[in-house]
Amino acid sequence: MAIERTLSIIKPDAVAKNVIGQIYARFEAAGLKVVAAKMTHLSQGEAEAFYAVHKERPFFKDLVSFMISGPVMIQALEGEGAVLKNRDLMGATDPKKADAGTIRADFADSIDANAVHGSDAVETAREEIAFFFAGMNVYSR
């Protein structure tokens, strides 16, 4: 399997619960390495630009409002099959449907406050990493 990179965001609800370390431990236990990371409080413009693909969806405004409601932890992860591996770790978007032991089953409150974001494909991951880490170094380890 190929070494890939994927973008992960620990959303405001999970940051507020102080579970960043527990989530990082799951990444590392699954063989994913953090190759870039930063904590930030997204502006409305940043959140709207990042989630622009959802602009016409009925949940867009609520998603943007939620994503700017508190700080987020953003990281680029690297490892074999990183995109799928991270999606497996996250679990289903709706935590009620997420398998036991996944990040969302353990830490998410609702389909809106669902703890984490992860890239859905290698190409999307490239774009998302460039969005948040433009001009910053991303280090393979």
UniProtKB/Swiss-Prot annotation:
Required cofactor names: Mg(2+)
E.C. designation(s): 2.7.4.6
Lineage top rank: taxon: Bacteria
Keywords assigned by UniProt, alphabetized: ATP-binding, Cytoplasm, Kinase, Magnesium, Metal-binding, Nucleotide metabolism, Nucleotide-binding, Phosphoprotein, Transferase
CDD domains assigned to the protein according to its UniProt record, in alphabetical order: NDPk_I
Enzyme type, top EC level: transferase
Gene3D superfamilies the record matches: Nucleoside diphosphate kinase-like domain
Alphabetical GO biological process terms: CTP biosynthetic process; GTP biosynthetic process; UTP biosynthetic process
Binding, ATP: 11, 59, 87, 93, 104, 114
Catalytic activity: a 2'-deoxyribonucleoside 5'-diphosphate + ATP = a 2'-deoxyribonucleoside 5'-triphosphate + ADP; a ribonucleoside 5'-diphosphate + ATP = a ribonucleoside 5'-triphosphate + ADP
InterPro entries hit by this protein: NDK-like_dom, NDK-like_dom_sf, Nucleoside_diP_kinase, Nucleoside_diP_kinase_AS
GO molecular function ontology, one term from the record: nucleoside diphosphate kinase activity
Catalytic residues as annotated in Swiss-Prot or TrEMBL: 117 (pros-phosphohistidine intermediate)
Assembly and oligomerization: Homotetramer.
HAMAP family membership: NDP_kinase
Functional description taken from the UniProt entry: Major role in the synthesis of nucleoside triphosphates other than ATP. The ATP gamma phosphate is transferred to the NDP beta phosphate via a ping-pong mechanism, using a phosphorylated active-site intermediate.
PANTHER family: NUCLEOSIDE DIPHOSPHATE KINASE, NUCLEOSIDE DIPHOSPHATE KINASE DDB_G0292928-RELATED
Protein name, entry field: Nucleoside diphosphate kinase
Species per Swiss-Prot/TrEMBL record: Polaromonas naphthalenivorans (strain CJ2)
